[in-house]
Amino acid sequence: MDFRQISPTTCTTPASSSSAAPPTPASSSSAAPPTPASSSSAAPPTPANCSTAAPPTPANCSTAAPPTPASSGSAAPPTPAPDHWWMEAPHHWLPGLLARCGSRQLPSSVGLACFGTAAVPRKPVNWACQGSHGELEASQVGSGKAGPCTPHPSLLGF
């Protein structure tokens, strides 16, 4: 009989031990998560900085590229003088006389190019410019009137 009373008491005692055991693992388990969390927290900030540094560099490169083409595009329109029409020959300048041309380019054989706008009405005029080594002529091709020869600004004082 006394033995039976000891058995239940023994069962009760292990129960207490069992109760103490769970809290310990729980604490260990609790301590483990915080450590990884800290490590994980430290890792993200580093990549974030790298990621931030990368975008600014490409942005600057990208910004530098557009201005260059924009400048080139801007340079093209200003080349034709807004108030003068003229023709230029790459191999030689014809002293004093240059034909006024319209929207049409000269034949490549003549080697002349036409530029300009406002001296003649701004409406496109169809002109064909024909020339030889010493002379330039403006002949009417379609709508438009033949214009007089005018000196190129660079030829003044030639």
Curated annotation (Swiss-Prot):
UniProt biased composition (Low complexity): 7-76
Q: Which domain of life is it from?
A: Eukaryota
User: Which portions of the sequence form the region Disordered?
Assistant: 1-86, 138-158
The name on file for this protein is Putative uncharacterized protein LOC387726
Annotated source species:
Homo sapiens (Human)
